[in-house]
UniProtKB/Swiss-Prot annotation:
The lineage of its organism: Bacteria, Pseudomonadati, Pseudomonadota, Gammaproteobacteria, Enterobacterales. GO terms for biological process: carbohydrate transport. CDD domains: ABC_MalK_N. It comes from the Bacteria. This is Uncharacterized ABC transporter ATP-binding protein YcjV. Keywords: ATP-binding, Nucleotide-binding, Transport. ATP binds at residues 37-44. GO terms for molecular function: ABC-type transporter activity; ATP binding; ATP hydrolysis activity.
Length: 360
């Protein structure tokens, strides 16, 4: 169990590339924190600084109140799971899981107890005598997790552990890691570029871009209240739709659209002096409905209709704007078809067109 405090953490390489910029985060005991962002955003570098595998260029890392900047990795009471399983091919599953404990000269009976306990949790009991080559990708990843679990560390770090698995296995392992967190009741920090993993697993998500933290919050918070256009577009699949326009009276207008803004949102826009200035409206695909209501109805033409099973993803053209609409599968939709869509303006978001920061 551990609490972490990252205070003004910086990472600058010798070539003056600034990879992580003024990273601040307080992590409570037993939290499941996910760092998410595109490639090169600094998420893995931050994780490696926590692990002691990268030197911290500036700021302080505290674990349970103790400054860890100069403490070697092996003394930080941290266990790490990497993207590649890093298993010894000539060793059995048991020996792979026990290897670190043997290096620490832990008593044989303690090693046996921990390995069997971890194997029971991970469903590996029947595979303990097998070698990695005889296992599936998901089973090998469980072995890598087991090797970390047996250390009984205060903090578990995971660097894109599921990226080598196929889609079905990723879904399965997501659930298994979440269950594992509940069973171990320990602090976990997980790195991924996959926003679905972040949304489904985290107690809090840290969204990064270009080495800078964009937003920290619970999955529902960052989805429903994104801090800026980057977060709004990165979290959610398909991504949020964005339309540039202006506010005229109680309407959001473009050259081809005119949508009525709810009073509560209009009041915020007025206090932020956003009237008659360039502004961006964002609306998620599930908040555009392929049916007519009393107002905010627009004619759209379907360019692509993707059936995913329970629903359609409709890629439409609306007055010169490309918009994605999520629709139920009760009706059939086809490319080239004209439909009427309704904007649920109570669910829309408005962003400053210049700063891209959320207004409401």
């Amino acid at each position: 169990m551990a609490q972490l405090s990252l205070q003004h953490i910086q990472k600058i390489y010798d070539n003056q590339v600034h990879v992580v910029k003024d990273f601040n985060l307080e992590i409570a005991d037993k939290e499941f924190i996910v760092f998410v962002g595109p490639s090169g955003c600094g998420k893995s570098t931050t994780l490696r600084m926590i692990a002691g595998l990268e030197e911290i260029s500036g700021g302080d890392l505290l674990i349970d109140g103790k400054r860890m900047n100069d403490v070697p990795a092996k003394a930080r009471n941290i266990a790490m799971v990497f993207q590649n399983y890093a298993l010894y091919p000539h060793m059995t599953v048991y020996d792979n899981m026990a290897f670190g404990l043997k290096m620490q000269k832990i008593a044989r009976e303690v090693i046996d107890e921990r390995v069997n306990w971890a194997a029971q949790i991970l469903g590996l009991r029947e595979y303990l005598k097998r070698k990695p080559g005889a296992l599936s990708g998901g089973q090998r990843q469980r072995v890598a997790l087991g090797r970390a679990i047996v250390r009984e560390a205060g903090v578990f770090l995971m660097d894109e552990p599921l990226s080598n698995l196929d889609a079905k296995l990723r879904v399965q392992m997501r659930a298994e890691i979440s269950k594992l967190h509940q069973k171990l009741n320990t602090t976990m920090i997980y790195v991924t570029h996959d926003q679905t993993e972040a949304m489904t697993m985290a107690t809090r998500i840290v969204i990064m871009k270009d080495g800078i933290v964009q937003q920290v919050g619970a999955p529902k918070t960052v989805y429903n209240q994104p801090a800026n256009m980057f977060v709004a577009g990165f979290i959610g699949s398909p991504a949020m739709n964005f339309i540039r326009g202006t506010i005229d009276g109680d309407k959001f207008v473009t050259e081809t659209l005119k949508l009525t803004i709810p009073e509560e949102k209009l009041a915020v826009l007025k206090t932020q002096e956003s009237l008659h200035k360039p502004i961006v409206m964002g609306i998620r695909p599930e908040d555009i409905h392929p049916d007519a209501q009393e107002e905010n109805n627009i004619s759209a033409k379907i360019s692509v209709a993707e059936l995913t099973g329970a629903e359609f993803m409709l890629y439409t053209t609306v007055g010169g704007h490309e918009l994605v609409v999520r629709a139920g599968a009760l009706n059939d939709y086809h490319a080239g078809e004209n439909i009427t869509i309704h904007f649920d303006m109570t669910k829309c978001h408005f962003f400053d067109a210049e700063t891209e920061i959320a207004i409401c």
